[in-house]
């Protein structure tokens, strides 16, 4: 059963026998005895969690540790802050790899896609399971590039805690703000790691201040650096008043010593640490009443007598309450500060049972899991990553997919180790599992044990909602909590190398869409071409590359275009009648609709009904009407772009007996399109938040270039020796900007983009765009 275990290098001779009742466990033990050393991807990997060294614990404790000992964490940050390098060091010190991976060398564990290894960036979030000092840690490394924001959203949805990694020389950067807001949305406790303390320009004080000012967070300084930039050699543990120094002659950072600070050896450092500890105690006491009472009653006269364990427990409570964030520092590349970071993860971040998942009360002890990622494996088929919130998952278990309203069977259950997977007999609540055999499950789907279990949960949620005067829709949302998919901002056509390869291209795109819901694929009704819609230039480029590498198709991409949207400016009415006879059956529909602009932003049309219609409307007819409205709003009258910020009201509807739902949809769609054409129309263009970090000498040419791109500069900040330009710029004007910026600044500047909103174009720019699209200019 455990053929995949052969990837782990172990000595089978020293594994003692274990009494295991389950027949599956006997198979696992037998497989362990047959293991042969094998090195995947040129790396030395250690054993399955719990099989550290020559000892093997009970199999249940290896696979399913106590829930209090589980930590589901993610690593999040701005691009190039050092997330993947930090992850590699974590895996190495936890005993899960036997050599240090390097992003520049392309041999990291969590960057397992070919494009990731080549580009040195993380595209997909890879889940890794390892042990640290008796704790089970499920860790997800996430991308920092704005084009892959969905990957961050996807993993944050299933995490209990997170490590935010910062470049100590840059502090809070643009994408850091984005992922921090996402973590706020999901109420995820965080700890901060100030990385790259060895880098020229690194400033602990500046980085901490940027967390306080830009993130509006209260930093708890648990460590102080010993030196900065080239002089950085270790950290001081403020809580225990100890210094941690790494051996300069050690190549891997495992060799470090922890010494108590003494007056005779480090008087200045001891004084600074004592002041920092006293400030920390006061700060935590202000945030935690229980700790404040303890300090006032027993340690008010001398904070030095306060035990470190009491302070650590209080910091844990404050972190869970999200009233402050612990701050640590180090250098992942130089192998300093990672072991204390791991200690902080187990000490301060929550276990699954400490997280308040309100929807769990509807399921009690039944299975409830969320599919948060889908991958396609050529041998195994679809691989679905799941976060188990309650119950147990086993191989051959039949499960019910609430979103897809279908029942499937899990054929195999795996423990994820980046792109290496180990087969296991069961997984319980709090864990992250990898399942094989689910062919219809997609990202964001809620998985339960059966349809009856889902109905029972819905009834409990509805009853509770009535007690709290909630709408049914909110109770339903609690049961079907999923992953929010952002709207794409770029699109281009894609064609196969030949007509005979069209089915292969469609299969590849279908698989990629299941893996990445932010990728949208549609058929252009006018040209019949397949259109790819994505989150950015890099996103589309990566998809194109994957089609070539993974599916062997040399597909051709059309020019990249901006995904504009359209809206209307006034209220209009329209009527339409569809009268058609097919065979001996007459289909007759008469519709009157009103289209008007909405006051709030709404990507999907808001659908309303006149009272006289809604009362007697059949459900199938209502679905047909809404399908017709949605279809009409997919293509606006100006550019053929989707319509947004519009409300459609159905004022009258006459349906002849025997009329099919297809004819109802067609009539409603045609009527809505007629109304949209009559209205005053407006093109909306994507407006991006832009942050450019540039040396002072190159500031003027950068500002001049942005002015030509219709940029709106909000402010110019000073960051160390650089200037940071913050503003807005239309997406259409920023295509290919990286090449221009490199030329203007001799390659010294960096920039970050994030979608802000869709703004109305001015009449002149709109006319220019329409003329260009129609071929007049």
From Swiss-Prot:
Enzyme nomenclature, EC number: 3.6.5.-
Taxonomic classification: Eukaryota, Metazoa, Chordata, Craniata, Vertebrata
Primary gene name: GFM2
Originating organism: Pongo abelii
Xref: Gene3D superfamilies: 3.30.230.10, 3.30.70.240, Elongation Factor G (Translational Gtpase), domain 3, P-loop containing nucleotide triphosphate hydrolases, Translation factors
Gene Ontology biological-process entries: mitochondrial translation; ribosome disassembly
One Gene Ontology term, aspect cellular component: mitochondrion
Family from the record: Belongs to the TRAFAC class translation factor GTPase superfamily. Classic translation factor GTPase family. EF-G/EF-2 subfamily.
Protein name in UniProt: Ribosome-releasing factor 2, mitochondrial
Chief localization: mitochondrion
Function: Mitochondrial GTPase that mediates the disassembly of ribosomes from messenger RNA at the termination of mitochondrial protein biosynthesis. Acts in collaboration with MRRF. GTP hydrolysis follows the ribosome disassembly and probably occurs on the ribosome large subunit. Not involved in the GTP-dependent ribosomal translocation step during translation elongation.
Keyword list, A-Z: GTP-binding, Hydrolase, Mitochondrion, Nucleotide-binding, Protein biosynthesis
Compartment(s) of residence: Mitochondrion
SMART domains according to UniProt: EFG_C, EFG_IV
Other notes: This protein may be expected to contain an N-terminal transit peptide but none has been predicted.
Residues of the tr-type G domain: 68-353
Binding site for GTP: 77-84, 141-145, 195-198
UniProt superkingdom: Eukaryota
Matches recorded under InterPro entries: EF-G-like_DII, EFG2, EFG_II, EFG_III, EFG_III/V, EFG_V, EFG_V-like, G_TR_CS
GO molecular function: GTP binding; GTPase activity
Catalysed reactions listed for this entry: GTP + H2O = GDP + phosphate + H(+)
């Amino acid at each position: 059963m455990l053929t995949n275990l052969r990837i782990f290098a172990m000595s089978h001779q020293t594994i003692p026998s274990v009494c295991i009742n389950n027949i599956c466990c006997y198979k696992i033990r037998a497989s362990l005895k047959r293991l042969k050393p094998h090195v995947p991807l040129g790396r030395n990997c250690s054993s399955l969690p719990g099989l550290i060294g020559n000892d093997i614990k009970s199999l249940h404790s290896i696979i399913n540790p106590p829930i209090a000992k589980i930590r589901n964490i993610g690593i999040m940050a701005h691009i190039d802050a050092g997330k993947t390098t930090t992850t590699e060091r974590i895996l190495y010190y936890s005993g899960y790899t036997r050599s240090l991976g390097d992003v520049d060398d392309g041999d990291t564990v969590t960057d397992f896609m070919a494009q990731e290894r080549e580009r040195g960036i993380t595209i997909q979030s890879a889940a890794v399971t390892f042990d640290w000092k008796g704790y089970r840690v499920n860790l997800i490394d996430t991308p920092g590039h704005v084009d892959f924001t969905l990957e961050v959203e996807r993993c944050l949805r299933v995490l209990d805690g997170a490590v935010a990694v910062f470049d100590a020389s840059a502090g809070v950067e643009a994408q850091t703000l984005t992922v921090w807001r996402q973590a706020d949305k999901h109420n995820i406790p965080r700890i901060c790691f100030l990385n790259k303390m060895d880098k020229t320009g690194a400033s602990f004080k500046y980085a901490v201040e940027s967390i306080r000012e830009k993130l509006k967070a209260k930093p708890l300084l648990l460590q102080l650096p010993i030196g900065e930039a080239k002089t950085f050699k270790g950290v001081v543990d403020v809580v225990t008043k100890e210094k941690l120094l790494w051996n300069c002659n050690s190549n891997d950072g495992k060799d470090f010593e922890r010494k108590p600070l003494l007056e005779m050896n480090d008087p200045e450092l001891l004084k600074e640490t004592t002041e920092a500890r006293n400030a920390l105690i006061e700060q935590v006491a202000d945030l935690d009443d229980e700790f404040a009472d303890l300090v006032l009653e027993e340690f008010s006269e001398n904070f030095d007598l306060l035990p470190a364990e009491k302070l650590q427990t209080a910091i844990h409570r404050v972190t869970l309450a999200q009233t402050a964030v612990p701050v640590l520092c180090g250098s992942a590349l130089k192998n300093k500060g990672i072991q204390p970071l791991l200690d902080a993860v187990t000490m301060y971040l929550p276990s699954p049972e400490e997280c308040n998942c309100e929807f769990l009360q509807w399921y009690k002890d039944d299975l409830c899991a969320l599919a948060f990622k889908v991958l396609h494996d050529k041998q195994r088929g679809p691989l679905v990553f799941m976060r188990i919130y309650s119950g147990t998952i086993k191989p051959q278990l039949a499960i019910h997919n609430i979103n897809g309203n279908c029942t499937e069977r899990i054929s195999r259950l795996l423990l994820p180790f980046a792109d290496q997977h180990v087969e296991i007999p069961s997984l319980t609540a709090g864990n992250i599992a990898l399942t094989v055999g689910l062919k219809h499950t997609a990202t964001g789907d809620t998985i339960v044990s059966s349809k009856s279990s889902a109905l029972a949960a819905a009834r409990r949620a509805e009853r509770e909602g009535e007690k709290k005067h909630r709408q049914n829709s909110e109770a339903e949302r609690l049961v079907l909590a999923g992953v929010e998919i952002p709207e794409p901002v770029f699109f281009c056509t894609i064609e196969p190398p030949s007509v005979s390869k069209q089915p292969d291209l469609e299969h590849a795109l279908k698989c990629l869409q299941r893996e990445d819901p932010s990728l949208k694929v549609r058929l252009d009704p006018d040209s019949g071409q397949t259109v790819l819609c994505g989150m950015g230039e890099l996103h589309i480029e990566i998809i194109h590359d994957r089609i070539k590498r993974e599916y062997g198709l040399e597909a051709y991409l059309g020019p990249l275009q901006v995904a504009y949207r359209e809206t209307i400016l006034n209220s209009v009415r329209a009527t339409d009648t569809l009268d058609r006879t097919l065979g001996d059956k007459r289909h007759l529909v008469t519709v009157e609709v009103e289209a008007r602009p909405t006051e709030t932003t709404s990507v999907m049309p808001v659908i309303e009904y006149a009272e006289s219609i809604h009362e007697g409307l059949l459900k199938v007819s209502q679905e047909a009407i809404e399908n017709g409205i949605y279809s009409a709003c997919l293509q606006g009258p100006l550019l053929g772009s989707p319509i947004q910020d519009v409300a459609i009201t159905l004022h009258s509807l006459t349906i002849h007996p025997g009329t099919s739902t297809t004819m109802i949809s067609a009539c409603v769609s045609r009527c809505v399109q007629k109304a949209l054409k009559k209205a005053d129309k407006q093109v909306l263009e994507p407006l991006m938040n832009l942050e450019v970090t540039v040396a002072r000498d190159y500031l003027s040419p950068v500002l001049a270039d942005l002015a030509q791109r219709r940029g709106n500069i909000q402010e110019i900040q000073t960051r160390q020796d650089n200037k940071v330009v913050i503003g807005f710029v239309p997406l259409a004007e920023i295509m290919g900007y990286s090449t221009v910026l490199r030329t203007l600044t001799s390659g010294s500047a960096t920039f970050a983009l994030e979608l802000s909103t869709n703004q109305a174009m001015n009449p002149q720019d709109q006319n220019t765009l329409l003329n260009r699209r129609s071929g007049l200019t």
